[in-house]
Amino acid sequence: DRRNTVQTGQPGARPWYRMVVRLIAWASTDVGRVRMANEDSFLVDASLGLYLVADGMGGHAGGAHASAMCADVVNKVVRRGMARLVGMPQQTWNDAIAEILQASASEASARIYDQAQMDRSLHGMGTTLTGILFHGDRGYIVHVGDSRAYLMRGGMARQLTSDHSWLNEQIQAGLLTEE
């Protein structure tokens, strides 16, 4: 892991200093000017270090239900997974956390799909998911869809995620331009 290589050249060695990160979390949603109802959900779980937003789609009942279900499932799966890290060697944590986040998104997707199959009034519901899990001195991003994660530093915003959309795929392939 080149990011952790210090002057000794030893992979995985930690620098002698510790970064100090000030985390400010807030959450708010707004229906905007076009829609009649809000389909967003968010989660701020400081005890776990998990922060996420889910932007529902598929009509008010469906989108709101999907985003709320996603936030709940991801929180529960991540909490269970992180509890299992305790007995694992620290050098395996990065991969384990990535697997936990992937499993949480997959589980949320499966549950939303199953719910939509059982209740026809929810047919077509879905949600985006963008979140971050802080553990130790690292942040791990989970991302599905076109809600974006940004890093704010020195008054500047840097986009950390790429949209999972047909349009973005076409732009990345050079078939379309952003204009």
Where are the model-predicted features located?
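Intrinsic-disorder-associated, low-complexity terminal segments enriched in Asp/Asn/His/Tyr and depleted
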Residues: D1-N4, Y17
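PP2C/PPM-type serine/threonine phosphatase catalytic domain
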Residues: G9-E179
